Every structure is written in C-alpha cells, then in structure tokens.
Amino acid sequence: MKPLNIIFAGTPDFAARHLQALINSHHNVIAVYTQPDRPAGRGKKLTASPVKELAVSHDIPVYQPGSLRKEPAQQELAALNADIMVVVAYGLILPKVVLDTPRLGCINVHGSILPRWRGAAPIQRALWAGDKETGVTIMQMDVGLDTGDMLLKTYLPIEDDDTSATLYEKLALQGPDALLQALEGLANGTLTAEKQDEVLANYAEKLSKEEARLDWRKSATQLWQEVRAFNPWPVSYFEHQGNTIKVWQTQVSTTSSNAAPGTIISASKKGIEVATGDGVLTLLSMQLPGKKPLSVADILNARGDWFTPNTRLNNEAQ
C-alpha cells in the first residue's frame, strides 16, 4: 500500500496514542493540528497538549488555530496537500470546506459503536446506561455531530469491574489498530461506507459534577453504574455529617431491605450496605475530605461513628 500523507488533528492523551501509531506506521504525518496551549496547574502556566508534545518530539509541524472557520486557516491547511485528515478528540468544529479539502476527506475515531452515543462522553454514558459492550467506530466525517458514514467498527465487552478509566485504556489500545486498518481499506478502496440509522442514535452528554451526586432513591444497579461511569471524573459523592464523601467503588448487594433510601443497613470491613430505591448498594471504597481514597475497612477505622447501622446518609448540600 502506498503511504498516505496525513494531517492529524487531536488534543488529549487519547489522541496522542493514535498519533503515535501513525508515526510508527509507514504513512507520513505531514502536519499536526491541536488546540492552542492552555493555562494549567497551580501556576496557570501555558501548557502544550499531549498531541503537540508528541509532534514536536518527532519534528512534525504543529498548527494551533483557534478556529478553522476563517479563510487564512483554511488556505494554510489546503496548502499542505494532504491525502486525508485523521481527527481524534480535536475539540474544534471542522466546517464543510475543511472536510472536503483532503483527497480522501476527514475521518474520525469515535469511542462508541455508532450511532449509539454520539457526542462528548461516549465511554462514560455506555457505563452509565448499563451497556454490555462498547467499541470504536471509524467514521467519514460530515458537518453533523458524529453523524457521518461508518467505515469500520470494533467491539469490546464491558466487564462488571470496568470504569471509565479502564474502558478509556482499553479503547485507547483498540482505536489505533482500527484506525490503521481503516486507512489501509481507504487506500485500497476496499471499505464500504455504511449509513447510520437515525432511529438508533442517541447523544452522550458531557458529565457534570452535579450529576455525580448519588440519589439513593435510584436503584442499586443504576447507582453502581453511575459510580463506575464517574470514575475517575467527576467521582460520585454524597453529603454526610457536613462533608462531601466521594465514592470510588461499589457493588450491588444480594441483601434485601425495606428501609428508607439512604439508610445504612450494615457496616463492616467487607463494606457499608445502603438501602436504595430498589435493592441495596454496598460501598467498598470511599474518600473523606482532604484524604486519599481508602477501603471501607480503613474508613470505618477512622470514622466508624459516621457510618453506624440505621444512620440515614444525607445527600442534601450542607
């Protein structure tokens, strides 16, 4: 297969994994587009994206326009004369003129099995909804939000102990292989584009800190899914004794209870069992204010008086 001249557009670590795969391949990455440097850390020092750092280390030209809607930026991109543009978590909208500029257009790596979970948080929403599988879709981009024709899909079962952190890692390994496979198919003309079924489409909205507040009136299963979805950010939490307590790991208990939602049923080193709107949730790992995440056994050693049976966990803001 003849090497393709590729423009890569991406910003976070997830994107950098894909850029590394392209650098390691026989293709030519002729330019990298990434978000402008942003203030980060306590000192608010201007910080380059992981994609920029990788590109600079390999002497690949880097472009950081604040927008691609203006003609000078579009002309600059067109002058690169790329065969294709690969977009992974870039963060800027590509207008139609940009999508149509490369010979083979622009393709995107998306962390879900489209058309399910279009949008910003597909990994988290798959867990939140209790999906049994996820995957990666390589898509020919159009002007819609993740609405383009699908070129290739890979599938990944979601395990009971998966969190957004673990799924992110798994998809960051799966995505680059899928991307290289799709590029080969595009170059050889062997890929058949598949339209997305709009009836099956749904939208993966961004997560919010407010959404991570545990509502004990929900079912134990739904809360278990949310805790996994919101790990590592924004992290599920509840209010108790005037403190915000983060919850990192739970499981659905086989215990049954008619107690009011939020009531502690039992507390031992094996876990703190809490009544919910349907079923009982066992808290396994939590984080007290200013402390590191700890097992429930360690939490009870430090603050066992907060978690005695029949105590009602208060989830109202103090």
Swiss-Prot record:
Its EC number is 2.1.2.9. SUPFAM superfamilies: FMT C-terminal domain-like (SSF50486), Formyltransferase (SSF53328). InterPro entries: Fmt (IPR005794), Formyl_trans_C (IPR005793), Formyl_trans_C_sf (IPR037022), Formyl_transf_N (IPR002376), Formyl_transf_N_sf (IPR036477), Formyl_transferase-like_C_sf (IPR011034), GART_AS (IPR001555), Met-tRNA-FMT_C (IPR044135). One of its GO terms (molecular function) is methionyl-tRNA formyltransferase activity. GO terms for cellular component: cytosol. It holds the Pfam family Formyl_trans_N. Keywords: Protein biosynthesis, Transferase. It catalyses: L-methionyl-tRNA(fMet) + (6R)-10-formyltetrahydrofolate = N-formyl-L-methionyl-tRNA(fMet) + (6S)-5,6,7,8-tetrahydrofolate + H(+). (6S)-5,6,7,8-tetrahydrofolate binds at S112, I113, L114, P115. Attaches a formyl group to the free amino group of methionyl-tRNA(fMet). The formyl group appears to play a dual role in the initiator identity of N-formylmethionyl-tRNA by promoting its recognition by IF2 and preventing the misappropriation of this tRNA by the elongation apparatus. Belongs to the Fmt family. PANTHER family: METHIONYL-TRNA FORMYLTRANSFERASE, METHIONYL-TRNA FORMYLTRANSFERASE, MITOCHONDRIAL. NCBIfam families: fmt (TIGR00460). This is Methionyl-tRNA formyltransferase.
